[in-house]
Amino acid sequence: MEIILGFVALACGLIVGLGAIGASIGIGLMGGKFLESSARQPELINELQTKMFILAGLIDAAFLIGVAIALMFAFANPFVSTLLANMPK
């Protein structure tokens, strides 16, 4: 049973870590493109800034969904409850 808990902890770490890496890369690329486009056309800064913040929120929402799934696996793990139900007594 300890090996399953170890693998669950590893999976939770991977979910959160890779999600954070992906979100930070996505927001970094988006911010760079925002700066390029606002330098090219300064009259569109207000429209571009609004769209950039909406997209940043969507990117962060995907990461937070991953965090919620990792927390579900960490605290309300369906695999461990199934394992405990099927263990011989």
UniProtKB/Swiss-Prot annotation:
Family membership noted in the UniProt record: Belongs to the ATPase C chain family.
HAMAP family in the record: ATP_synth_c_bact
Q: Which GO terms describe its molecular function?
A: lipid binding; proton-transporting ATP synthase activity, rotational mechanism
According to its UniProt record, where is this protein located? Cell inner membrane
Instruction: Provide the alphabetized UniProt keywords.
Output: ATP synthesis, Cell inner membrane, Cell membrane, CF(0), Hydrogen ion transport, Ion transport, Lipid-binding, Membrane, Transmembrane, Transmembrane helix, Transport
The record's Pfam families line, in alphabetical order, gives: ATP-synt_C
Q: What is its main location?
A: membrane
Specify the protein's topology with respect to the membrane: Multi-pass membrane protein
Q: Its GO CC terms?
A: plasma membrane; proton-transporting ATP synthase complex; proton-transporting two-sector ATPase complex, proton-transporting domain
Q: Where is this site: Reversibly protonated during proton transport?
A: D60
Record flagged with keyword Signal: no
Q: What CDD domains does this protein's entry cite?
A: ATP-synt_Fo_c_ATPE (cd18185)
- Where exactly are the transmembrane stretches of this chain? 3-23, 53-73
Q: Which gene encodes it?
A: atpE
Name-wise, this protein is ATP synthase subunit c
Q: How does it assemble?
A: F-type ATPases have 2 components, F(1) - the catalytic core - and F(0) - the membrane proton channel. F(1) has five subunits: alpha(3), beta(3), gamma(1), delta(1), epsilon(1). F(0) has three main subunits: a(1), b(2) and c(10-14). The alpha and beta chains form an alternating ring which encloses part of the gamma chain. F(1) is attached to F(0) by a central stalk formed by the gamma and epsilon chains, while a peripheral stalk is formed by the delta and b chains.
The role this protein plays is: F(1)F(0) ATP synthase produces ATP from ADP in the presence of a proton or sodium gradient. F-type ATPases consist of two structural domains, F(1) containing the extramembraneous catalytic core and F(0) containing the membrane proton channel, linked together by a central stalk and a peripheral stalk. During catalysis, ATP synthesis in the catalytic domain of F(1) is coupled via a rotary mechanism of the central stalk subunits to proton translocation. Key component of the F(0) channel; it plays a direct role in translocation across the membrane. A homomeric c-ring of between 10-14 subunits forms the central stalk rotor element with the F(1) delta and epsilon subunits.
